[in-house]
């Protein structure tokens, strides 16, 4: 196991390595996982073109408003705030608090202080600390987070990751262990109303070809302990 600070594709960040995994994380760019290789296969591939045009790439962190909201507004504790799809932190710099390796694990932990020094604080005026850890294990990458409420009142938030897995020119299939899907408007705003999976969009509890799907939906009502899965021909 090894972790080192390095320059990769012209970007400074941290390379986590073991016998089967290589994971490059850039704390200065929202703790984004730029690339993830497993046994020589690029499972998440760096996309310079998307980076240059400021699109999403890698594994961006979406916090505190990961999804769309009606008229770009959210309601919280009796007040209305401006919102932004994909959140406010996906390109913000995180401070590295740990970068270490032992015989089983290589990891990097980054921390973002969300306070009045942040340019978008008025959009989410709740002082807090977001900590993210990316950990490389043998044949596994674990992404985890913690949110600490530093304010005096209540705080609510949403968080998600948006991984760009590489199809690698294969007939990739996916499963999602969700029994329901949220209804959404023509503008793709989730309404919160749940409908059975398969009624209007595919039921992904059985494998489906990615190339056959066109989805921008919220799948939910998941079986406890189950995971979404991606199936490659050579894995």
What residue spans do the PLM features occupy?
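Extended, loop-rich substrate-binding clefts of extracytoplasmic carbohydrate-active enzymes
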Residues: 1-4, 77-138
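Short solvent-exposed loop/turn micro-motifs enriched in small/polar/acidic residues
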Residues: 6-9, 65-67, 89-92, 125-129, ...
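Short hydrophobic/aromatic-rich beta-strand segments that constitute the beta-sheet cores
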Residues: 25, 35-36, 110, 142-144
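Beta-strand-rich N-terminal accessory domains
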Residues: 1-60, 64-73, 80-84, 226-235
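Acidic, contiguous internal or C-terminal segments within carbohydrate-active enzymes
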Residues: 27, 114-157, 161-168
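Active-site/ligand-binding surface loops and adjacent short beta/alpha elements
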Residues: 154-155, 164-235
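Hydrophobic residues embedded in beta-strands of well-ordered beta-sheets
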Residues: 14, 104-108, 141-143, 228
């Amino acid at each position: 196991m090894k972790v080192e600070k390095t320059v990769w594709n012209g970007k400074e960040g941290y390379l986590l390595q073991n016998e089967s995994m290589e994971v490059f994380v850039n704390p200065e760019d929202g703790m984004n996982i730029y690339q993830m290789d497993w046994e020589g296969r690029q499972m998440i591939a760096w996309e310079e073109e998307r980076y240059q045009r400021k699109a999403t790439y890698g594994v961006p962190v979406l916090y505190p408003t990961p999804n769309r909201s009606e008229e770009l507004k959210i309601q919280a504790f009796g007040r209305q705030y401006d919102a932004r799809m994909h959140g406010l932190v996906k390109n913000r710099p995180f401070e590295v608090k740990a970068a270490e390796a032992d015989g089983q694990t290589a990891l990097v932990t980054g921390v973002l202080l969300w306070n009045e020094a942040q340019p978008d604080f008025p959009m989410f005026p709740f002082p807090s600390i977001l900590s993210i850890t990316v950990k490389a294990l043998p044949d596994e990458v674990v992404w985890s987070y913690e949110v600490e409420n530093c304010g005096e009142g209540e705080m609510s938030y949403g968080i998600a990751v948006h991984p760009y897995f590489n199809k690698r020119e294969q007939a990739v299939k996916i499963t999602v262990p969700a029994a329901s899907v949220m209804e959404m408007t023509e503008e793709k705003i989730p309404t919160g109303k749940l409908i059975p999976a398969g009624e209007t969009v595919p039921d992904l509890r059985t494998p489906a070809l990615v190339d056959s799907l066109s989805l921008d939906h919220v799948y939910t009502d998941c079986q406890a302990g189950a995971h979404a899965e991606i199936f490659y021909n050579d894995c």
